[in-house]
Amino acid sequence: MTEGSWERARRILAAAGLPPDRLARCRPLDGGTYNTVEELLLTDGTRHVLKVPPPRTAPGMRHERELLVSEAEFYRSAATVDVPSPRVVATGDRHLLMTACPGQSWNGTLTPDEQSALRAELGGLVARLHQVTGPGFGYPSGALGPLAPDWRTAFTTMYDAVLDDARRYRAWLPRPVDEVARTARAAYDALEEVTTPRLVHFDLWPGNILVDRPEGTPRIGGLIDGERMFWGDPLADFVSLALLGDIEDDTAFLSGYRKAGGRADFDPAARRRLALYRSYLYLIMLIETVPRAVGDDDAAWTRKVVAPQLVAALDDIGRHGAGRSKG
């Protein structure tokens, strides 16, 4: 912890109406790849989490501007349907202060029965998230402009922005950028089936799912890191929920999701949309290695593991039938 971090934390606590003298510890948290994340422990044992974005001049992808605006929107929305997540304490131009959720990131110490029960519980929570509707489609941060009146307009804007980032950073991709654009465009008509903007977290990999054991039995303690959220097609959440895999293989999750009222139909049009969303996430994972300036080993791992998934998603777009794209 630096002296600057300590003083910044005290200043933000004071602005939030919390006595800064109650700050007992300020320590960095692992896992953040864009924002600085710190845990603030108060003298009464209360834990808060503080997020601070990088300088505005730092390299990044277009959709990453004002991520904390989107994150606060996610937590406020999740609270309306009683999904465990951080509570927003205070927001500012350059910070987000929130409560800390109990538990540790989902890991490999769970038994198969515990895994199955938690996946079913997670399915129910995600179904509740998808009940929340928004005022329009897209990123509420305004990073790519105002919310759009329809999903096709919003998602094609999101996709084009990522491809523009690939060109701008000269990022390596397993297929040429223009070919990726043409392939995706062939499935854009399937987006027109989505008519209601729903809450999508879009980053629900195990690292962002906290597991708590309040009475010995594991329960989900919180869904965190909602900074990638957008208003759109709930089907898009299935990508990170089955990162580098296939959500249709996760029978426990789908059972819990459907039992809680979630709709999970995998007809050809849905599979085309899902392939689009998979390609979108895997493009981001490949492209962001450039502005993040990750090391050679991390870049090589991403190419080895993620690039084949991007190719498979693009192939699936064609496999599930090309639509009557209008561009």
Which residue stretches match the model-derived regions?
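Flexible, glycine- and charge-enriched loops at secondary-structure boundaries
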Residues: 2, 61-68, 111-119, 243, ...
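An alpha-helical support segment within catalytic cores of ATP-dependent transferases
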Residues: 4-21, 102, 112, 116-120, ...
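Short, surface-exposed alpha-helical segments at coil->helix boundaries
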Residues: 6-10, 69-72, 251-254
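ATP-binding pocket architecture of kinase catalytic cores
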Residues: 26-156, 160-161, 168-171
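Helix-rich C-terminal or lid/interface subdomains of diverse kinases
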Residues: 29, 34, 121, 160-161, ...
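Active-site acidic catalytic loop and adjacent metal/ATP-binding pocket
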Residues: 30, 35-41, 49-50, 88, ...
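Short strand-connecting beta-turns/loops that link adjacent beta-strands
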Residues: 43-45, 93, 214-217, 279-282
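Short beta-strand segments
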Residues: 49-52, 89-90, 138-141, 199-202, ...
